[in-house]
From Swiss-Prot:
UniProt enzyme class: transferase
This protein's pathway: Carbohydrate degradation; glycolysis; pyruvate from D-glyceraldehyde 3-phosphate: step 5/5
Binding site for substrate: R36, G246, D247, T279
Protein name, as recorded: Pyruvate kinase
GO molecular function, one term: kinase activity
Domain of life, per lineage: Archaea
Binding site for K(+): N38, S40, D70
Site description Transition state stabilizer, residues in chain: K221
Reaction(s) the record says it catalyses: pyruvate + ATP = phosphoenolpyruvate + ADP + H(+)
Protein's UniProt keywords contain Signal: no
Organism: Thermococcus litoralis (strain ATCC 51850 / DSM 5473 / JCM 8560 / NS-C)
E.C. no: 2.7.1.40
Length: 475
């Protein structure tokens, strides 16, 4: 078998433009590692069919594709629009109404009854991740009359942002918990928690999953100033982080976003947890076959910052070129990774070495792995794992070698789909080193006399963490 051309993981949102079996097949072949289901749109019946299609296609292609379910959260959204979209032009008057109607260019329904209580004359309201800007002219009992300051095309169920508004609702809603139950039932691998404000939002979901005896990977989406302020505690509780730049760039000064992204990626790397950079990465490809030069640079810089994964949203959900968007992301990743060595794990190693010396044996071993990679021409890193931690500890250094991870847990293997440079293999229970070598040789990944590095826990057969590193040539 042939490993992917790039190590950065690509998450693609499945929607009306990409839910067809043939399109999903092409996206997987192009490099999609994770299929994202956005539960803010569509019905659960539609999502169940999409999940089934992704699983079926991935199995036939013999590819491992994880499924991420993105929860709606507390986000205010516009309602249903006639024809699914409307063009709002600068200077137009438009009314936001809490009435349950179908919207048009003059009246837009909102799915939040308390909207009139949150705004006053002169306030700014943003729609569709800040692309459209409205100024409040008059507030009535169930309506807000506005003038369009920045126009654009508004689609059904797009988000509403009111900077500095205090939303009187929980971050994780009752509807979210219903969707989590659906996700458990349908074998979704990970859930994205929208509009997390504090560690308690993460812990509440973790507690719910524990009661359901479910071990879904919990990814906290950072899209509110509160989440940035409480980031360290959120990072400690979550399994992974998504930097959701659309809402974050509206809720805080946009000029602070680039540095904030770098800081959050660095912290998540240090914690050895996967970090996803999301929103508007190749957004021009929603309608154009070739992305903007600035978008290509944005993707490359996120990869150089240390992101594990990059995410496509409307580009693949509703765009004209879903397959081409994945292909472009893969091309950018491949080219950028070739230049990482001068900026990559040496910098992260310096950061880690500057931390207080509280390393575990496993962490010390993974640091030694990086030293060995710098000294010897090693082809692959082989990491048997029960929890996925050892591959992630190595992955944070972003080495140029593939990390081949082996686990008897299907869930662990799917969760590793979010980590940079990790290619997971699901093994039978009680597999050993001989089984690993037979597998990778049989697949044609390694050849006789290739030098590989193996991490393992000794004594073999005992439930112990990684405590040993060996370098040897494939017999």
């Amino acid at each position: 078998m042939e490993l992917p051309s790039h190590k950065t993981k690509i998450i693609a949102t499945i929607g009306p433009a990409s839910k067809q079996k043939e399109t999903i097949k092409k996206m997987i072949k192009a490099g999609m590692s994770v299929a994202r289901i956005n539960f803010s749109h569509g019905t659960l019946e539609e999502h169940a069919k999409t999940i089934e299609t992704v699983r079926d296609v991935a199995e036939k292609l013999e590819r491992r594709v994880a499924i991420l379910g993105d929860l709606p959260g507390l986000k205010m959204r516009v309602g249903k629009i006639k024809g699914d979209s409307v063009t709002l032009r600068k200077g137009d008057k438009v009314v936001l109404t809490t009435r349950d109607i179908e919207g048009d260019e003059t009246t837009i329904p909102v799915e939040f009854k308390d909207l009139p209580k949150l705004v006053s004359k002169g306030d700014t309201i943003y729609l569709s991740d800040g692309y459209i800007m409205l100024r409040v002219e008059e507030v009535r009992e169930n309506e807000v009359e506005c003038v369009v300051v920045n126009g654009g095309i508004l689609f059904s169920h797009k988000g509403i942002n009111i900077p500095k508004a205090n939303l009187p609702i929980e971050a994780i809603t009752p509807r979210d918990f219903e969707i989590i139950e659906f996700a458990i039932e349908h074998g979704v691998d990970a859930i994205g928690l929208s509009f997390v404000g504090s560690v308690y939002d993460v812990l509440k979901v973790k507690s719910f999953l524990e009661k359901k005896s479910a071990d879904l990977f919990v990814i906290a989406k950072i899209e509110r100033p509160d989440a940035v302020r409480n980031f360290d505690e959120i990072l400690n509780a979550a399994d992974g982080i998504m930097i959701a730049r659309g809402d974050l760039g509206v809720e805080m000064p946009i000029e602070k976003l680039p540095i904030m992204q770098k800081q959050l990626i660095k912290k998540t790397n240090l914690a050895a947890k996967p970090v996803i950079t999301a929103t508007q990465m190749l957004v021009s490809m929603t309608t154009e076959r070739i992305p903007k030069r600035a978008e290509v640079t944005d993707v490359a810089n996120a990869i150089l910052d240390g992101t594990d994964a990059v995410m496509l949203s409307e580009e693949t959900a509703i765009g004209k070129y879903p397959v081409e968007s994945v292909e472009m992301m893969a091309k950018i990743a491949k080219t950028t990774e070739e230049y990482r060595e001068s900026l990559g794990y040496s910098r992260l190693r310096a950061w880690i070495d500057s931390l207080p010396k509280r390393s575990t044996i496993k962490e010390a071993i993974t640091r030694s792995v990086i030293d060995a990679l710098c000294a010897i021409d090693i082809k692959y890193i082989l990491t048997p794992t029960r929890t996925g931690l050892t591959p992630r500890l190595i992955s944070r250094f972003k080495p140029k070698q593939w990390i081949l991870a082996f686990s008897s847990s299907e869930r662990v293997c799917n969760n590793l789909a979010f980590s940079y440079g990790v290619y997971p293999f699901c093994m039978d229970e009680n597999f050993n080193e001989k089984d690993i070598i037979m597998l990778v040789k049989g697949l044609g990944i390694v050849k006789e006399d290739d030098t590989v590095l193996l991490t393992e826990g000794r004594p073999i057969g005992k439930t112990v963490g990684t405590n040993t590193m060996r370098i040897f040539q494939i017999p």
